[in-house]
């Protein structure tokens, strides 16, 4: 797949900002130059080398191991032989490393451990510079700023307190550090992955690249079809953003989909295999307790989480407690040895408006808070997954309860969808809820594509989902008073009022689409300097009339 960056993001170049504490780190940002060539703004960029016009990437080679020296220079990790996996050699990543890194002893190698010990890591400085997006010179345009300047020390404090996480497995050195927390920019996740109906490794890798070029901050590989292990290896080796998974899917695949044959040893083996590959965060459905399952029987849509349903069925078959819950501390020992973050799964989330905010959902949430405390004692990073399907008037309660039960650990929500009546448009029904819940304090929003509830998303669906959720996240950032969000709106509105059409296109989330819509009715180059568009024409343009009014008032 050939991506033309000059078409997707005209008048943009990747530039690299050096660190101050760590002089050797360089943070990539997208510089958008205005048509007058004298002004520009910097935009947070998630594409890594895939969004740099000067770098030719090849998915067969993977991308640069940006953090490898940072990791090994700490001298608290060592190489060992990776577990041997029986996979189809014809689909294997060609440059697969047979060694993996792990902590040298029982001491954690997590960003939380370093933060608690007053160590500012290169990862922490990196995310601080990314979050600021060079806003200092433009702060005069940001009234009512309520978010402080992001410094490496602030990042350290937030990670140490558990209010933010930096997902960064030591076996994923290709990743560019990013931070998830309510005092930072709202992030978005894009789900990709094959199914039993559709399995194509090349297609999934390109979905990942497409997603991050358009702004996905993390990607989850939710593959349930063929070649799960190899698909994930290809994705990780080519990904500059953190990769998350739901390990229970592959564990179930190992027992041919027979839930009753699952056990903790199979799950543990799967965790370690994925840890060695470099997965940055795991969704673990440890809060689905046996005693909670009874409260889902009267729901309209029952248990809609795949992981939650698997665990519930296992508990029912064996009449035993959830093995993820009973072995949680052993899972923590694995996580802290590789710096894998927990994404504590909401296996009992509501799957319909009728089931929102019910007893099962909030009992599980309370348990997730208890598990968060245990993980923090092991210096593991934690975020909490949330719903789901929730009407607008019930959204705030979700955030309030999550903050209370989970002690401000970052909240990561799927939408929520605010109505169930629009299959084919659930990227919109969910973006309404996503913007609201982001404003209330959710740290990361999991995108929903137009194909939700209908089928596996294709490349265009991925793009639509990412753009829709970038809008929701940005709207939440504006509501929270984030100055870097305000600056982009200010710049685009200024271009719009002054009929600088190309600057208006180029500052938008999707310049290619914005320009194509303008071209449908006014395709000529002359129209790109006209003081009107086809909506109002030259006589009824309110902005043109306002310009004349302002001119008259100065005479």
From Swiss-Prot:
It comes from the Bacteria. [4Fe-4S] cluster binds at residues 533, 536, 541. Binds 1 [4Fe-4S] cluster per subunit. The cluster is coordinated with 3 cysteines and an exchangeable S-adenosyl-L-methionine. Keywords: 4Fe-4S, Iron, Iron-sulfur, Lyase, Metal-binding, S-adenosyl-L-methionine, Thiamine biosynthesis, Zinc. HAMAP family: ThiC. Homodimer. This is Phosphomethylpyrimidine synthase. It comes from Ehrlichia ruminantium (strain Welgevonden).
